């Protein structure tokens, strides 16, 4: 009898964590990011590609933390967890790793740019080298 009561309570408890994480991570595209950046100067853009990729072109003002470096997650952890971040790479693999880590580390709001830097460049939005 107790098991029948506890199981639904436990499932509800676990689902609240999944919902909370989903609320903190939002998938966006480069057009949405462009609009967001025009509306708010408080957004922090995080490019998780290699330094060579970053130097070849990146969104203006972006921070570069190469997620494949051994110290990448410790660098990410030093960022303000209450900030609003837009994270991108080239194909979503590296940005996905970074976003997952950020969610597990308690970052409040993270946007993953799903079309990556190629999507940004293809729309002819300004970028810097």
Question: Model segments located where?
Answer:
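Structural scaffold elements adjacent to functional motifs in cytosolic proteins
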Residues: 45-47
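Rhodanese-like catalytic fold shared by cysteine-dependent sulfurtransferases
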Residues: 2-7, 18-43, 52-84, 90-129
């Amino acid at each position: 009898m107790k098991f029948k009561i506890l199981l639904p309570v436990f499932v509800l408890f676990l689902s609240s964590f999944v919902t909370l994480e989903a609320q903190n991570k939002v998938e966006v595209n480069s057009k949405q990011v462009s609009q967001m950046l025009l509306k708010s100067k408080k957004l922090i853009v995080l490019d998780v590609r290699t330094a060579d990729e970053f130097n070849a072109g990146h969104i203006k003002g972006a921070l570069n933390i190469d997620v494949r470096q051994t110290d990448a997650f410790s660098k990410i952890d030093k960022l303000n967890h209450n900030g609003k971040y837009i994270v991108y790479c080239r194909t979503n693999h590296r940005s996905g790793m970074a976003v997952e880590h950020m969610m597990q580390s308690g970052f409040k709001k993270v946007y993953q740019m799903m079309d990556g830097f190629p999507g940004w460049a293809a729309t002819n939005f300004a970028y810097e080298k």
